[in-house]
Amino acid sequence: MILMMKNTKVLETNKDGSIMIYEEKLLPFSLQKEDLTYEDFFFNWLSVRPLSIGRTNAKAILNNAGIPQNSLTIARICHGMNLSDCYWVKEREEDTSWDKDNLYDHDMDPLYADTALTGKSHHLSKDKFHTPELTAQGVSAKCWIKENDGIYLYKVGRKELPASEILDVLGIDHVHYEKAEQLKEYLSKDRIKKIEDVGEIIVRSKLITNQQQGIIPFEEFAVWCANQEIDDEYEEAKRRDEKSYYEMQIADYILNNSDRHVGNWGFYFDVEENKLQGMYPLMDHDHSFDEEETLMSQTNEGKTLLEAARIAQAQLNLPVKDILEIPKPEYLMDNEWEQVRKRVMML
């Protein structure tokens, strides 16, 4: 098997378990280590590219296409292509190329998208398909749709809208979500009604990566830190982009976000140079406005969200009181808004 970065051969595995590295500087960050092995490539990198079986509608996607629930098999079938970077894999004699098959330039299979978002059954082809759904991370129901002005993520997530509005007030860089008014083009009225009847809506956000700039989640950044013998990956993250790191502490407290984890924050990187840049915009706030009053920070060890936010606010002095001047955001419940205002006053 050959690991490619666009049209450049990066690494090749052999049947005897050996590997040949062609472009060391282009290795994925989690593979940048001494004594890289065959097992590192297959089991620590390739096997974690595909979607999680625990993701909503994941089993429907795989079952409808007749794809086994085996991560390496899934990765081989979809060439490990995703919308986070420009890496992909192919067999030595396989007739395919980046220009022919990459997800950024070509239309996507709409049936995969419908199954991914709603769970609807379709006969999906595993022999000829073009979809990022087999490598989309996270657990919520979601899908990618290519439109005239770019690629959009559609997901079930009422809370993304008020979270976006609040972060706009704070001036914190984040992925902007909007109500998916275009939904009628992809789903029937009955399916939209079923989602709205349970108090949810479908929102969309524009893809933040492209063929020049990719992202790596903190989970992979932490592996890279360990391989570079950097003792504290959180301190290293803060050192590399202190402002964004502190903004995340404040955002998670104000939103009372219970779902900041190693897979939904991290860094941009330059695809051609394979060099880390600053943190990418904050995202995934569909578990915000948690009812629990005291949540522990997942990005500042041993601190509550309030304690971590106070440390950050002492550094940034963001205009948090401006939140008190805006009307209650649409789609936010009265009690959720009351708790937001209470947290602002405590900060």
Predicted regions and their residues:
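Conserved protein-kinase catalytic-loop segment immediately C-terminal to the catalytic Asp
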Residues: 261, 266-269
